[in-house]
């Protein structure tokens, strides 16, 4: 007889250091199994070729995962000059080759030219959908789908190392930026072609790798130790302003009603807490000046 594993209603944010060789969804399922979590979601895909920071939201934290999905991110990228590939990275077949005569000053100038608001054509080897089918599925069939350029922002690029054939750069960018495409565009600007040799995500929003754990480390922990490395649900939105409500206001807000707080003037979303410091959820000030609930925790209202 087979028994179903009991799922846990566990809430929090895990900072995972995803290894090479597995997809973000595979990493998510491993974490979900280790925590026996009833609900989990990641906050922005990393290709199997890429390693690094993958925040995973468990339980009620999934209500706020889209804020991390939309957040700025930074990466360390290894770029190989002198060749292009079918996938834009080291896993593809070489399409073109050219001699590399680039100097470091020329490379640095091109990198700085890429900083700012730019347009990127998404790669065919991506999870973007066309008529319900992922672009990479078309690419594997040899079908090229026209893609419209998308606006992204490159906040900064720092050249870390250059040996004449390869270079490492740290890129800070907006959501939706494809580092593979950035590498290809740099190679095109240099006139020699380029492809991505390796990629590691360093930050997502205000999170970094300092307190991230690996799947192997999680696997060796007891359940209590695993639970202890989880961040609180509100960690995903800690950049939002804080508003504290008295007991009566908190009660009515958790019933879905608008409440009032004198002297409040905040634009946009803010975090709501009880006088005891319990996180209630997100609220927003209406045009009338009242506080309207926007996203509340399940436990807070129970």
UniProtKB/Swiss-Prot annotation:
The keyword tRNA processing applies. It is an enzyme of class 5 (isomerase). Keywords: Isomerase, tRNA processing. It comes from the Bacteria. The keyword Transit peptide does not apply. One of its GO terms (biological process) is mRNA pseudouridine synthesis. Its EC number is 5.4.99.25. Disulfide bonds: none annotated. This is tRNA pseudouridine synthase B. It holds the Pfam family TruB_C_2. The active site is at residue 47. GO terms for molecular function: RNA binding; tRNA pseudouridine(55) synthase activity. Belongs to the pseudouridine synthase TruB family. Type 1 subfamily. Signal peptide: none annotated. Responsible for synthesis of pseudouridine from uracil-55 in the psi GC loop of transfer RNAs. It comes from Methylobacillus flagellatus (strain ATCC 51484 / DSM 6875 / VKM B-1610 / KT). It catalyses: uridine(55) in tRNA = pseudouridine(55) in tRNA. Gene3D superfamilies: Pseudouridine synthase, PUA domain. The lineage of its organism: Bacteria, Pseudomonadati, Pseudomonadota, Betaproteobacteria, Nitrosomonadales.
């Amino acid at each position: 007889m087979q028994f179903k594993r009991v799922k846990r209603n566990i809430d929090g944010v895990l900072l995972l250091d995803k290894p090479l060789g597995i997809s973000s969804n595979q990493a998510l399922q491993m974490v979900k199994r280790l925590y026996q979590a009833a609900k989990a979601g990641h906050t922005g895909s990393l290709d199997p070729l890429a390693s690094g920071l993958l925040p995973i939201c468990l339980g009620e934290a999934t209500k706020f995962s889209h804020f991390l999905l939309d957040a700025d991110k930074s990466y360390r990228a290894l770029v190989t000059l002198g060749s292009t590939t079918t996938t834009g990275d080291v896993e593809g077949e070489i399409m073109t080759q050219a001699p590399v005569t680039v100097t470091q000053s020329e490379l640095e100038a091109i990198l700085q030219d890429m900083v700012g608001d730019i347009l990127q054509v998404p790669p065919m080897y991506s999870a973007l959908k066309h008529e319900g089918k992922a672009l990479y599925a078309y690419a594997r069939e040899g079908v090229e789908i026209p893609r419209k350029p998308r606006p992204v922002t490159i906040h900064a690029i720092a050249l870390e190392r250059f040996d004449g054939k390869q270079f490492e750069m740290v890129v800070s960018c907006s959501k939706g930026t494809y580092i593979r495409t950035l590498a290809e565009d740099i190679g095109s600007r240099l006139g020699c072609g380029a492809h991505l040799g390796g990629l590691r995500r360093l930050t997502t929003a205000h999170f970094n790798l300092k307190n991230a754990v690996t799947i192997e480390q999680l696997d060796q922990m007891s359940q209590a130790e695993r639970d202890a490395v989880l961040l609180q649900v509100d960690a995903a939105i800690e950049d939002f302003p804080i508003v504290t409500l008295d007991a009566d206001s908190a009660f009515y807000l958790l019933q879905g009603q608008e409440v009032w707080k004198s002297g409040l003037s905040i634009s946009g979303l803010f975090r709501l807490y009880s006088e005891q410091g319990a996180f209630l959820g997100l609220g927003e000030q209406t045009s009338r000046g009242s506080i309207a609930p926007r996203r509340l925790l399940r436990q807070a209202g129970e």
